[in-house]
């Protein structure tokens, strides 16, 4: 591992921790030339996952692209970086757990939508407005009505059980 500060190839591992879910390893490293300390993360390299887009083209699954879409949706919301990482990990694990090596972009959108709907309603609306390509205000209103109806149903169910 090269030092990101001076480029030296000789670094040593100071500390190693496995993530809570066991899917990655965090290592603290120190450069043996300049003593710069930095963190690296290791995760298993999955068999190549492909994404079939709406226009029929196929491209490699891009974890960073998924993360960027989620980060745009949760921007200026009370959602931590750790939560975003966990959401990305969950979606990626779900996709990798499927037999098919080619998944549709709509499946990815549905998985993210489901997670955001329970996490943060505003982030959910932001995400689905892009994912479903809303072009009219009525589309926002329909989605908001669905979210509010679901919340009302949940509220009524919790009050009737008391």
Swiss-Prot record:
InterPro entries: ATP-cone_dom, NrdR-like_N, RNR_NrdR-like. Keywords: ATP-binding, DNA-binding, Metal-binding, Nucleotide-binding, Plasmid, Repressor, Transcription, Transcription regulation, Zinc, Zinc-finger. GO terms for biological process: negative regulation of DNA-templated transcription. PANTHER family: TRANSCRIPTIONAL REPRESSOR NRDR. Belongs to the NrdR family. One of its GO terms (molecular function) is DNA binding. A zinc finger (unnamed) spans 3-34. It comes from Halomicrobium mukohataei (strain ATCC 700874 / DSM 12286 / JCM 9738 / NCIMB 13541) (Haloarcula mukohataei). Binds 1 zinc ion. This is Transcriptional repressor NrdR.
């Amino acid at each position: 591992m090269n030092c990101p500060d001076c480029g030296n190839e000789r670094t040593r591992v100071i500390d190693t921790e496995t993530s809570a879910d066991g899917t990655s390893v965090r290592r603290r490293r120190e450069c043996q030339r300049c003593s710069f300390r930095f963190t690296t993360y290791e995760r298993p390299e999955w068999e190549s996952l492909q994404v079939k887009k709406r226009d029929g083209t196929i491209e490699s699954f891009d974890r960073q692209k998924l993360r960027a879409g989620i980060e745009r949706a949760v921007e200026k919301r009370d959602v931590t970086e750790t939560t975003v990482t966990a959401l990305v990990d969950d979606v990626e694990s779900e996709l990798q757990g499927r037999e098919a090596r080619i998944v549709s972009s709509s499946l990815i959108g549905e998985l993210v939508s489901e997670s955001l709907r329970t996490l943060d309603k505003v982030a959910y609306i932001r995400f689905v407005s892009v994912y479903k390509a809303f072009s009219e205000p009525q589309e926002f209103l329909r989605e908001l009505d669905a979210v509010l109806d679901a919340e009302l149903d949940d509220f009524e169910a919790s009050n009737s059980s008391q």
